[in-house]
């Protein structure tokens, strides 16, 4: 007779999605050794930048996707939801760069399998403020977004992955040639990946 699960057992996570994906390495389950870790990022970058055919195809794909119109929709038809919709629109229109600029950078993740961006916030004090942490078109004092800063895939050393759940908690980023590193948590980031196949945090490059 099959044992009946307790509620605690039913809610627990027992297995993992892939053989090595929880170790946080880029493309840890990749069959070809030369396409594992940061070597994979270097190879895809070389293909994108040095192969004219690949570069042209990627450019065409990215241009098509950039032409898609984006709209902010309220959660429901209530007045409160409509007010928050307008607030979100104001936040996206009050960054150091345009939303189109971010989309253009974000589409680069297709080549590498994933894209990581750090969200830097600010207080919306007013247009006369010199500090980028306070400068804004608005004077409502609410929290806004200063910038959505790209963190290039070739600077990412590894993902911080929860051993039990496979949840991505953040990334370790290399800093220059001095051997330093930054830790960027997911809750301060925008994180894109092409696929969640096998729980791989680095996704899968469309060039693979």
Residue ranges and their predicted role:
Residues 1-98:
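Extended, helix-rich architectural segments
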